[in-house]
Amino acid sequence: MIRESRRELRNRYRKLYAEGRTRDDCFPLLVPTLANFRRTFSIRGRLLLTPELSGEQFDDSVGLFGNWITPGPVHELPYRVLLPAELENVWAAGRCISVTGETCELTRVIPVAAMSGEIAGTAAALAADAGSSAPGVAGGRLQEELRRVEFRFHREEL
């Protein structure tokens, strides 16, 4: 990937110089040393939150996130996007939760990553205290604990 981007950069400047530009006013100022990965992987969750689902209301909603790119609607974060489909006591948080497309762009930022981390940590603590599993703390008890620290789950609560 890095070599390909360097090759493209060299080709771009060859073309510009062939069109008459000179090195006096046309040159790369900075060349990235690392590939810019926004997302490399995500879990296959019990629910994949797609852009088509992002306007839905979910019974297992554990938080809300907004569209920070353009003014837009507030979306619900279902608990199932934090739970890997085939693992019992594992929670995901941050950029690796089960989302895709535009929803990935909306959830990859620090506020949503931090929120999902707090939710996953709270769920793990509740499961440990109750001797339960990740799916076992969905709904009631988890939402009750999150509401205690002022989480909102549905748009009409705003």
Predicted feature descriptions by range:
Residues 1-158:
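Flavin (FAD/FMN)-binding glycine-rich loop and adjacent Rossmann-like elements that form
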